[in-house]
Amino acid sequence: MTQHTLTRRGLLIGSAALLAGLPQLSLAQSGGPSIHVLKDPNCGCCSAWIEILEGDGFTVTTEASMGTMLMRYKSDNGIPQEMVSCHTGQVEGYMIEGHVPAADIRRLLAERPNAVGLAVPGMPYGSPGMGPESEREAYDVFLILHDGSTEVYTNYEAA
């Protein structure tokens, strides 16, 4: 019968292997970036946008909010009035206002600019959750800077 003893070296190698695998385990369990969304509970387009994000691997939690409470949340978190849309999300310290495509959110998280976040003001037809992309009208995704100014982050031409 063979007797196995645990050496310090074996313990260190095993521990290192376990720790190396933890980030992958964590990502597999979470399903991707987590975004918390404040929205009017009666808004169908907000729900459609959330379904698109979930289909793209985001983990989404929601909170019902409307009227002055929602507008105050937007303002308190650096969303300029001219950038406002129907729902507001927060992901990894960034604000996401309106029907921002998942690809732009992923790009934001990869690039990590010094900014408040992204916005698609209004509700442009054909943006995620707002009708078929094949019929979309032209719209811009804006990067909101900390001084309240904005710059075009991505331009989507009409289909």
Question: Where are the model-predicted features located?
Answer:
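Stable alpha-helical elements in mature extracytoplasmic
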Residues: 49, 66-69, 101, 105
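Conserved helix-turn-beta segment immediately C-terminal to the redox Cys motif
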Residues: 52-61
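Thiol/selenol-based redox catalytic cores and closely related redox-interacting motifs
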Residues: 75-159
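N-terminal secretory signal peptides and thylakoid transit peptides that target proteins
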Residues: 1-19
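Thiol-based oxidoreductase modules, predominantly thioredoxin-like and allied folds used
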Residues: 60-71, 91
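Boundary at the C-terminal end of the N-terminal hydrophobic targeting segment
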Residues: 26-28
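Local sequence-structure signature of Cys/Sec-based thiol-disulfide redox active-site neighborhoods
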Residues: 33-48
